[in-house]
């Protein structure tokens, strides 16, 4: 049976597609062994074991951005990680390395080269990260979420691998039950605000200032502030604050409109099930979130606003009227669904299994 090593992690944007592909591979090949490579500090340390997979860990290795002491220490630390992963490959008889970006992916790509283990890469964002740019050079196959992502001639659009809870979600059928489980009223317009697994300080700061104005119209808010953020609940009626949600499918099903960052994972989940959204791209980094959102905005399924412009006045002028306009929300929902995909995990699993089938035979694992 096949032994898979899935490498990635750090945030939900890396962990969720990894778990979606793991679940798809396990469903197709129940006797296979699926190992996950990550770090102790990342979200994977909690989510991977909870999903029933074995987590192997290496030290967290951020790529250095400046020629300083961290850059000097990086090379030997990276070499140690590569050696550690090579031993894992030999001892566990790993047949393929599947990388999703993040701290664990780059050394896994490097480690797979010498023993001739095929590498398959999935890139979530429209603008690829450094680890996956390196991995794509040696990969047998590359899956991308967005058309036009520059990862070489082997890149194939597969969409975002989504957890089954999202990929099979029927919002209309479960909306009332989702609202009940989340402690929300069944019949009120519902705004979901989320900044991702670590939260978004600027979104939190703005929304808390206008929460009372929004709920005064009869609407309700579910605000996921993020586990890494300090936040004081103001105690406004119908303003529900939670730190983090492991059941985002419930939150998405409950929502009429979402305010969100434009990370590839969140965007792909919302478009897959046709949820209208206001996207506020993260203003730091390589700008990938602003690129991610172009397709859904062009289709009419979302609105984009710069982080600096996402002010209380902007929310009252744009979000509040939209939340009370069911016809506009219905049009946006249909447009969002037109650019979403639900079968990314299956298509990515096809790439992985094809790479395994094409690999040359290798010696058995050491026992």
Swiss-Prot record:
Listed NCBIfam families: murG
Entry's Gene Ontology cellular component terms: plasma membrane
UniProt keyword annotations, A-Z: Cell cycle, Cell division, Cell membrane, Cell shape, Cell wall biogenesis/degradation, Glycosyltransferase, Membrane, Peptidoglycan synthesis, Transferase
Domain of life according to the entry: Bacteria
Descriptive protein name: UDP-N-acetylglucosamine--N-acetylmuramyl-(pentapeptide) pyrophosphoryl-undecaprenol N-acetylglucosamine transferase
GO biological process assignments: carbohydrate metabolic process; cell division; cell wall organization; lipid glycosylation; peptidoglycan biosynthetic process; regulation of cell shape
Gene3D superfamilies linked: Glycogen Phosphorylase B
Compartment list: Cell membrane
Protein residues bound to UDP-N-acetyl-alpha-D-glucosamine: 11-13, 125, 163, 197, 289
Record InterPro entries: GlcNAc_MurG, Glyco_trans_28_C, GlycoTrans_28_N
E.C. numbers: 2.4.1.227
Leader sequence residues: none
Gene Ontology MF terms in the entry: UDP-N-acetyl-D-glucosamine:N-acetylmuramoyl-L-alanyl-D-glutamyl-meso-2,6-diaminopimelyl-D-alanyl-D-alanine-diphosphoundecaprenol 4-beta-N-acetylglucosaminlytransferase activity; undecaprenyldiphospho-muramoylpentapeptide beta-N-acetylglucosaminyltransferase activity
Membrane topology annotation: Peripheral membrane protein
Pathway(s) annotated for this protein in UniProt: Cell wall biogenesis; peptidoglycan biosynthesis
Functional description taken from the UniProt entry: Cell wall formation. Catalyzes the transfer of a GlcNAc subunit on undecaprenyl-pyrophosphoryl-MurNAc-pentapeptide (lipid intermediate I) to form undecaprenyl-pyrophosphoryl-MurNAc-(pentapeptide)GlcNAc (lipid intermediate II).
Family from the record: Belongs to the glycosyltransferase 28 family. MurG subfamily.
Gene: murG
Reaction it catalyzes: di-trans,octa-cis-undecaprenyl diphospho-N-acetyl-alpha-D-muramoyl-L-alanyl-D-glutamyl-meso-2,6-diaminopimeloyl-D-alanyl-D-alanine + UDP-N-acetyl-alpha-D-glucosamine = di-trans,octa-cis-undecaprenyl diphospho-[N-acetyl-alpha-D-glucosaminyl-(1->4)]-N-acetyl-alpha-D-muramoyl-L-alanyl-D-glutamyl-meso-2,6-diaminopimeloyl-D-alanyl-D-alanine + UDP + H(+)
């Amino acid at each position: 049976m096949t032994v898979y090593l899935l490498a990635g992690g750090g945030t939900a944007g890396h962990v969720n597609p990894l778990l979606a592909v793991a679940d798809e591979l396990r469903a197709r090949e129940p006797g296979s062994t699926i190992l996950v490579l990550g770090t102790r500090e990342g979200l994977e340390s909690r989510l991977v074991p909870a999903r029933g997979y074995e987590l192997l860990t290496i030290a967290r290795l951020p790529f250095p951005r400046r020629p300083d002491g961290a850059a000097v220490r990086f090379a030997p630390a990276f070499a140690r990680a590569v050696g550690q992963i090579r031993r894992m490959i030999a001892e566990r008889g790993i047949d393929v390395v599947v990388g999703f970006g993040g701290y664990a992916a780059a050394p896994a790509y490097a480690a797979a080269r010498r023993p001739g283990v095929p590498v398959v890469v999935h890139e979530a964002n429209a603008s690829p990260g450094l680890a996956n740019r390196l991995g794509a050079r040696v990969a047998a196959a590359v899956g991308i979420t967005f058309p036009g992502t520059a990862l070489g001639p082997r890149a194939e659009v597969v969409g975002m691998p989504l957890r089954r809870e999202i990929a099979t979600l029927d919002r209309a059928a479960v909306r009332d039950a989702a609202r009940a489980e989340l402690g929300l009223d069944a019949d009120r317009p519902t705004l979901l605000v989320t900044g991702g697994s670590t939260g978004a300080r600027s979104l939190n700061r703005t929304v808390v200032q206008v929460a009372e104005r929004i709920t005064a119209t009869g609407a309700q808010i579910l605000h996921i502030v993020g586990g890494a953020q300090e936040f004081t609940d103001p105690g406004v009626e119908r303003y529900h604050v939670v730190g983090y949600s492991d059941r985002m499918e419930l939150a998405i099903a409950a929502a009429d409109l979402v305010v969100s960052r434009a990370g590839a994972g969140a965007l792909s989940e919302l478009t897959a099930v046709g949820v209208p959204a206001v996207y506020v791209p993260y203003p730091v980094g390589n700008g990938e979130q602003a690129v991610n959102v172009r397709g859904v905005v062009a289709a009419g399924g979302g609105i984009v606003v710069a982080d600096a412009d996402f002010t209380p006045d902007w929310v009252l002028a744009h979000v509040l009227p939209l939340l009370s306009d069911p016809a506009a929300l219905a049009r946006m929902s249909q447009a969002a669904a037109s650019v979403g995909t639900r079968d990314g995990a299956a298509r990515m699993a096809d790439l992985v299994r094809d790479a395994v089938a094409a690999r040359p035979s290798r010696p058995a694992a050491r026992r």
